[in-house]
Amino acid sequence: SFAECMADALPLRETAARVGVSLYTAWFMRMRVCEVMALRTPDCRPGTFHVDGTLVMGSLKGNLGRSGILGLPRPRHRNGRDGRRASRGRSKEWVVVECGVNELGDCFCDVCGRGSAGAGELSVELAARIPAGSAVVTDGHKSYGFAARGYRHAEVDARDPSSGDINMVNALHSRLKAFLRRFNGVSTRRLQRYLDWFRYAEAFKGGGMDGRERLFMHEAEGRYWKTRRLTHLECGDAMVYWTRQIADMSTVV
């Protein structure tokens, strides 16, 4: 069944062949199930959260014409290598994924801007994901001093082991990158859906129920809000940069 394919994180072509549907239908079913996963993942419980961001290379893969985005606002990348070579550091072509995890295993992973997340973006993110009364442990990035002001906040210095560590979130980053590598690149405008999928898998990985059975139950009971048309028009904050680039190119021409 499709739930089994999603639980095993199979590629789209293999999923379509196993379920007996077209590649497009398999893709849309995946988007629908990701929507259910986002709604079914429990909120984080209070605790001590290790928080840090990681960078994911921006990707324009997919049928951009369906969303009204015409043309590429940059030279085409070959296997992702050209983009990494030309966009080292905190380039706007990198998407910030802000992550946090506590000692209970509760975690969050959300798109949080491009290049480098600002204090305002981080404040909104932490307030939305971390319950009141929790403690937050971060690195020395100055934006966290403002963003975590509503929590008990501790900073660690990577050069001083005695100041503590943020190993829990570093391990979460590794698992997230391994998860995304299965798909050979994820479109930036769909990235949050895949982050929701990863968070769902993390939330239920230690449960007694079989993951396939649980996902099938959640699919059957879930509600879907996005139609096919709305899914194609989905853009997301991380794509605003590219739409502006395209607009600027059109103005120059």
Name what the model sees in each region:
Residues 1-253:
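Residue-level recognition of single "structural anchor" positions
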